Amino acid sequence: MFFDVLTLFPGMFASPFADSIMGKAVKRGLVQITAHHLRDWAEGKHQITDDVPYGGGEGMVLKPEPVARALRDLRQRRPHSRVLLMTPQGKPFCQESARQLAGEESLVFVCGRYEGFDERIRSMVDDEFSLGDFVLTGGELAAMTIIDAVGRLVPGVLGNRDSAASDSYSDGLLEYAQYTRPAEFEGMKVPDVLLSGNHAAIARWRRQQQLLRTWLRRPDLLERACLSDEDRRMLQELQRQADSGEQ
C-alpha cells in the first residue's frame, strides 16, 4: 500500500516509521511511505507556499496553487489515490475509518500548517479527517497516526493476522483486560479463570470484560455496537451486579 504525504516538514516522517512493526513493513515492501516537500511544487525564486489571509487576521494561509500542482502530479503517478485532508473540522477518525481506508490502493495526505489553508483546497480532496476536538500545530501528527492505524491493517503487516481482530474497537467494544506472568504481583492476582485452561470459560470472561469495560468507560459505543442476545443478557447481568454492589 502506498502512503504519500504533502508537507512542509518531510523530515518529521523519517523516525516514526523506521522501527517497530511499521518499520518492518516498510523494509518488507508491504507499505511505502513517502513524504513530499510541498515547496517542490511552489513557483518563483522563493518558492512561497503561504500568504496573508484576505480580510486580515493573524497568521499565514496555505496557498492553493502548490497543493493543486502537487495533487495533479501525484494522481498521475497513482491514479487510484484517495486524497485526505488533515483538519480539525474533518469527520472524526475511528477504527471503522481505518478499516475502510485499508482497502484503498494508495492514500495521499495533505497536511496544513500555520493559520490554516485556503478554502479552495477542500475541493481538491476526497475526505477530511480529524483526530478529535483539539488543534495541533500541523497536520503531520494526524497523518502519522492515520498511517499507523491503516498500515497495521494491511495484510501481512501484523505477525498474527488475528491480532487486529481482537483490538479495542474492532467489534465496536473496548478490549478485555490482559495479563502475563507473574500470576501475582504486589498482591494483585491474575483472575483464576485465565489460569484454568478452560477455553470456553476464558472466552466468556473476556467477552464479559469487554462489555463491562465498554459500559463503564465508553457507554456511547454500546449504542452502535452489534450485540448478540447473549451479549445483552451478559450486559444486563453485569449492570445488575454493579447496581447491587456485587462487582
Curated annotation (Swiss-Prot):
Transmembrane segments: none annotated. One of its GO terms (cellular component) is cytosol. S-adenosyl-L-methionine binds at residues 112, 131-136. It is found in: Cytoplasm. The keyword S-adenosyl-L-methionine applies. Its EC number is 2.1.1.228. PANTHER family: TRNA (GUANINE-N(1)-)-METHYLTRANSFERASE. Homodimer. Specifically methylates guanosine-37 in various tRNAs. Belongs to the RNA methyltransferase TrmD family. This is tRNA (guanine-N(1)-)-methyltransferase. It comes from Syntrophotalea carbinolica (strain DSM 2380 / NBRC 103641 / GraBd1). The gene is trmD.
